[in-house]
Every structure is written in C-alpha cells, then in structure tokens.
Amino acid sequence: MSSIVVVGTQWGDEGKGKITDFLAEQSDVIARFSGGNNAGHTIQFGGETYKLHLVPSGIFYKDKLAVIGNGVVVDPVALLKELDGLNERGIPTSNLRISNRAQVILPYHLAQDEYEERLRGDNKIGTTKKGIGPAYVDKVQRIGIRMADLLEKETFERLLKSNIEYKQAYFKGMFNETCPSFDDIFEEYYAAGQRLKEFVTDTSKILDDAFVADEKVLFEGAQGVMLDIDHGTYPFVTSSNPIAGNVTVGTGVGPTFVSKVIGVCKAYTSRVGDGPFPTELFDEDGHHIREVGREYGTTTGRPRRVGWFDSVVLRHSRRVSGITDLSINSIDVLTGLDTVKICTAYELDGKEITEYPANLDQLKRCKPIFEELPGWTEDVTNVRTLEELPENARKYLERISELCNVQISIFSVGPDREQTNLLKELW
C-alpha cells in the first residue's frame, strides 16, 4: 500500500489540481478531504480545459474512483451542475463516490454567508459566499444535515424544519433578514439528493478496502496551508483544515496510511481575498507576474494579489503539514524579470524572525527581508530536466529548496501536462 497527500503550501491556487492530475494516472483512488465548492482547480485533459470545484480530479479516469470524503461540505445543486457539465462534454462520472457522512450546504448557509460578511463591514474576511463557513458552523453545533440524512425523506424533512425555525430567529435577530423557507428548499434539494443517491456510500470503507488490496491512493487537498483554520493567517482563513493531517479526519483513515506529503507552491506567491501578505507586490514586477501568470481566481474570477516567494511561509507549511517533497509550479512566469527575490525572514519591531507569527497585529508589522538573485530571459517552457534550466533559474530553485529544507521532486514550466516534470519516482 502507498498513498500520497497533495497540499497547497501557500494561500491556495498553487496548481494542486494539475499536480494531482499528473499523479492520478498511477493511482487507483483519488480522494478529497476538505473544503467545498469554494475551491477551484483547473485541469487540462484530452486537449481541453476543465474548471472543477467539488469533483475530485480523478473523475477523468473512468477506471479510478473519485471520492468526496466526509470532511468536504457538499452543495448538492452545485455538484449536480458540475457533473452535468462534465457529462455534456463527454466525461462519464459513474466513478464518483460521496461520503454518506459529508455535510450538506443548503440555501440558508449561502444567505448566512452573505449576511455575515455584510455585517463585518471593513473587517470582512473575503469569503467566496458559497456557504462553506456556515455549513461547518452547523456541523460543530451538531445541527448539520449530512448526505445520509438528505437521502431519507422523513429525516430530511424533520431536520430541515427544525433548522429553518432556528435560522429564522437567528437571521431576524442578527441581520433583520428572513431565512429561505421550507418550501424554497425541500423539494429541490431532496430531488438533488435522489439524483446523487447512486454515488453516496461509506467512503471510509472504500479507502480501507483500497489499502487492504495494496492499491495506490491519492489524497487531493484544497486551498492551502496558510488558509488552514488553525495554522493559517487566522481569521483570514477558510473554515476547515487543508493541512495533510486532516486526511485522517476528512476521509476516515488512520494516520499510518499516509506515505508521502507533496507540498505544491508557485515560484512566487499569490493570494485571493483579504488578509496579511508580507511579500505582496504593487509595482511593475507585480503586474508582470499577475498578467503573465493569469492570476485570476478559478471560483471568483477576482484578480489575485501577487508577491515574491516567501520561505517563511513555506517553512511553516512544511512543518505543520509534514511535507516530504516539493512541487514548484509557474517557473516560466518569472522569465524576463531582471531580479527575482526570496523572502528569507521578517523584521518585526527591529528584530529578525524566521518563523511565522500567530498574532495578526504582529504579522501586519512584519517587513520582509529579501535575498536578491539574478533573473533569466531564456524561454523555459520546453525544459524537461533541472539541468536544462537556465543557470539562474536552477539556482533560484536550489535556493528555495535549501531555505525550506525540503527536496524538489516536481517542477513545472507551464500550464500543460507535458510541462510538468518529475525528478524522482513518488509511487
């Protein structure tokens, strides 16, 4: 048995989907373990581009299982729209499996997300307003509705009526707004559940069977470590745990099942939404990176904030996620810059620190300490080995590996599959 966890080491959008797809060819099962349809990833398959939000990357391989684990929050209507879109383009989806313990996102979660963000005013978090946070809140409050409940008509009716009564009082008191009614929700979402019924099962058992059969399992992360509810830039984070350790909770397998953890990063840094970003760029270099790298959110379409590579962030991610191997994407985006920079430490109140602060106010006062390296002008998009890279590009990657104390096992010089290069066998 072998398994690999793929996690983002920054604030999401690192290219995890492409790396997951790249590794999926040799795996038997691909499983998601956190997040919801707030996570967007772009996949190149069969010469076409696909943008997925809930469906695991493994859906494109009909001989492999694509699993949505119990740690994922599922909007049934959004999921069906995604599945229908794939079917219309000739992609079969019969290999999908959904955990019967996954929480369901309902219309009142989307409304609550909108109202709460509005109430925050200038302190808004930058939520995608997909209902993710409120769904996880209901899970912890033990009033959440799970996929297993959605499939049973009487159970769903009883729980939905109870929740709407609670939400109506909450919405009125907190926002002076009304909650979507029972009639607005019940028939549409029960019907959606019935359409998804064939996919719903105990996915923990599927994964356990795969391990017993000595199959290869790939765990697909969403967002990034710096958006982790515990280890990220709190409170500007997501509502779940994208770190590798959440594989055990989010899919129902034991920690001994994990063999390797691949941390995916860009050769620079990007972020969507609000929150601290010590190496953020506002100059021509930032404009170059955003436009050449097409830095616009898959889910929101919002322009991403961009900045220099931050080794303080990556060291933090390596430690809290147990990263064994590094995949560096988008090296080609930096081509043409005279100088490239790596943040090696921060200056906080006149002192140099090398670890990421937990306190938000301290983080806002941090100034990046940069190491400058010469850039390169040579086209790298057809490079297939480290040795073929321009010397300056190769030294840049080697310095990142050295600063972060993790080996580079994959590097990518463009968006296409053939531009993703494996430096060592991972399975």
From Swiss-Prot:
Keywords: Cytoplasm, GTP-binding, Ligase, Magnesium, Metal-binding, Nucleotide-binding, Purine biosynthesis. The keyword GTP-binding applies. GTP binds at residues 12-18, 40-42, 304, 330-332, 412-414. The keyword GTP-binding applies. Pathway: Purine metabolism; AMP biosynthesis via de novo pathway; AMP from IMP: step 1/2. GO terms for biological process: 'de novo' AMP biosynthetic process; IMP metabolic process. InterPro entries: Adenylosuccin_syn_GTP-bd, Adenylosuccin_syn_Lys_AS, Adenylosuccinate_synth_dom1, Adenylosuccinate_synth_dom2, Adenylosuccinate_synth_dom3, Adenylosuccinate_synthetase, P-loop_NTPase. IMP binds at residues 13-16, 38-41, 128, 142, 223, 238, 302. Disulfide bonds: none annotated. Substrate binds at residues 298-304. It comes from the Bacteria. The active site is at 13 (proton acceptor), 41 (proton donor). One of its GO terms (molecular function) is adenylosuccinate synthase activity. Its cofactor is Mg(2+). Its EC number is 6.3.4.4. Mg(2+) binds at residues 13, 40. Its main location: cytoplasm. NCBIfam families: PRK01117.1, purA. HAMAP family: Adenylosucc_synth. Homodimer. Plays an important role in the de novo pathway of purine nucleotide biosynthesis. Catalyzes the first committed step in the biosynthesis of AMP from IMP. This is Adenylosuccinate synthetase. The gene is purA.
